[in-house]
Each structure stands twice: as C-alpha cells, then as structure tokens.
Curated annotation (Swiss-Prot):
Keywords: Endonuclease, Exonuclease, Hydrolase, Metal-binding, Nuclease, tRNA processing, Zinc. HAMAP family: RNase_Z_BN. Zinc phosphodiesterase, which has both exoribonuclease and endoribonuclease activities. This is Ribonuclease BN. InterPro entries: Metallo-B-lactamas, RibonucZ/Hydroxyglut_hydro, RNase_Z/BN. Homodimer. It holds the Pfam family Lactamase_B_2. Zn(2+) 1 binds at residues 64, 66, 141, 212. The gene is rbn. The active site is at residue 68. Binds 2 Zn(2+) ions. One of its GO terms (molecular function) is zinc ion binding. Zn(2+) 2 binds at residues 68-69, 212, 270. It is an enzyme of class 3 (hydrolase).
Length: 306
C-alpha cells in the first residue's frame, strides 16, 4: 500500500499546494489497483507530475461534496475518456454525487467511453472484496461527509511444501488450494487439511483516510488501531475554536485523536491557505508535542506502508 499526495491545501490552492487528492496504489492478490481519494480542482494536472495515469484508476472515493474535494472530478472523468481508456471506473461518495456527475456531463455535452458506476454510500461497509475491506464512517462537517477505513485482509502463512511432499502430496495444482487453507482429497482417499501446513498469517495493514471533520466520537472508532491515519489539520491550535465551528480540526486535536486511537503513524494534511511552509512546520511541531510519529504531507509526497 503506497500513498501519493496530489494536493494538501484546504479551501483554495496555494503556489505550492494543490487541492485535496490522494492516490492509493494497491497490490492486489492477482493484479495491481489504483484508487483515488477526493479530487479537488487541478487533480488531473497533478497526475502529470507523477508516474501514474488517471486511466489506470479503478475506484475514486469522495469524502464530501465541497468543491475543494470534488471540482476536479468532471474534468478528470472526461479526460480519461478522451484518452481512449476503456477500464471500468467506480465512484463512491455521499448522496448527491451521482446527480453532480451526471449534471456536469449533461450540461457540458460530455460523456464517458468507459463503464462508469456511481455508488452513493452511507455509514457502514462499502465493500469487502479482492483482499480489502472498506468501511465509511460519518464525520462532523456542515455537509454529509465520510472517512474511509481501508483494511487489508490478512495474508495466509507460508505453505510448508517440503512437509507436504514428505507426507506424499505431489506438487501441483493442489498446492494452490492447500495454500488457501482448504481441504483436498488425494487419489488414495486421504484428506489433507491445508491449514495444518500453513505458517502464521501476516496481519493486513489498516489505513484511515479522513474527510473534513471536527472532533467527534466516530473519528475515534474509525482510527482505532490503524497503522496509518491521514487526517486534516486545517488550523493551528490557537485557532481550534474557529476550526471546530467550521467543521474542521486543529493540529493538537488531530494529534490527540492519533494518540487515543493508538495509530502507528499520523500524516497531517489539508492545511489552510493562510499557512506558508513555515506555518505548516509550526503545526507539525504542535502535533509532535502530543503524538511524536507525525508526518507533514506535502504535494507529491510518497509514503509506503511497510
């Protein structure tokens, strides 16, 4: 699991920070997948500065319908079509996403030449398939807003092939079934339980990507035990009251959540345009006073989940 931050600004862009968008590059059991979280204005332009291409996207998750998280979506969808891409794309987001996309395409005389599916989510399970479970959590913001918790399925333990051969199981297609912990029947009638030949499973990674939010109980539930938490840090601690009144979080409120939830790493992002590089570093220092393992997201920063 690898994150690439395409935009880390809140509200409006700055000279060094674009609007919110994050690529999640996944290595699936049978194929690679690429997901996008939010699509602020200029996202497709940010792609040009990365090794990735919008045509390779499989899924796009929108946290809420505020423009700084959404206004880059129609252009990206149309460009993807103009480039002759036929890979199906699924959009996930709150109620109103389908109407927004269909209206933008209709009024601009645009269309997509690839299968486009739009799924409006509610609180709870979004899907559990192909190695990953995604759950949407409602957050505290002036409009309907969600965070997404991505849980990687545990990886099966190593198959003890040497022991299987020693027990008279011939190498071949049966090993694939045994690797999944299944039972197989040999030609001689013996039943072999694959789980007995597997080493310990490797726990999957958990990633929590938040939309905009003021502190709320659901945030703790969403973040609990995550290996990585990506969370907005819109304003410095001295402006916490102002941040909360607008459905946002301050630096130390975000850090306190990371600490209470027991996350491994906090990546702070979504900084107000009032802050230059020095101002963002000040907020990073405020976060680290409470939660030491905090990173400051920057446009085009890449973070690999080990």
């Amino acid at each position: 699991m690898e994150l690439t931050f395409l935009g880390t600004s809140a509200g409006v862009p700055t000279r060094t920070r674009n609007m919110t968008s994050i690529i999640l590059n996944l290595q699936q059991p049978t194929r690679a997948e690429m997901w996008l979280f939010d699509c602020g204005e200029g996202t497709q332009h940010q792609f040009l500065h990365t090794p990735y291409h919008p045509g390779k996207l499989n899924k796009i998750f929108i946290t809420h319908l505020h423009g700084d998280h959404l206004f880059g979506l129609p252009g990206l969808l149309c460009s993807r079509s103009m480039q002759g891409n036929s890979l199906p794309l699924t959009l996930y987001g709150p109620k109103g996403l389908k109407e927004f996309v269909e209206t933008a395409l209709r009024l601009s005389g645009s269309w997509t030449d690839y299968p486009l599916t739009i799924i409006e989510v509610g609180p709870g399970l979004v899907f559990d398939e192909e190695g990953y479970r995604v759950t949407a959590y409602p957050l505290s913001h002036p409009v309907e807003c969600y965070g997404y918790r991505i849980e990687q399925h545990d990886k099966p333990g190593t198959l003890d092939a040497a022991q299987l051969i020693a027990d008279g199981v011939p190498p071949g297609p049966l090993f694939h079934q045994l690797k999944r912990g299944q039972r197989v029947t040999l030609e001689d009638g013996r039943v072999i339980d694959g789980s007995r030949y597997l080493g310990p499973a490797t726990p999957g990674k958990t990633l929590a990507i938040f939309g905009d939010t003021a502190p709320c109980p659901q945030a703790l539930e969403m973040a609990r035990g995550a290996d990585v938490m990506v969370h907005e840090t819109t304003l410095e601690q001295a402006m916490a009251e102002k941040a909360n009144s607008r459905g946002h979080s301050s630096s130390q409120q975000t850090a306190a959540l990371a600490k209470e939830a027991g996350v491994g790493t906090l990546i702070a992002t979504h900084f107000s345009s009032r802050y230059d590089a020095e101002g963002c570093l000040k907020m990073l220092a405020e976060c680290r006073e409470i939660f030491a393992n905090t990173l400051l997201a920057e446009d085009f920063m890449v973070y690999k989940m080990a």
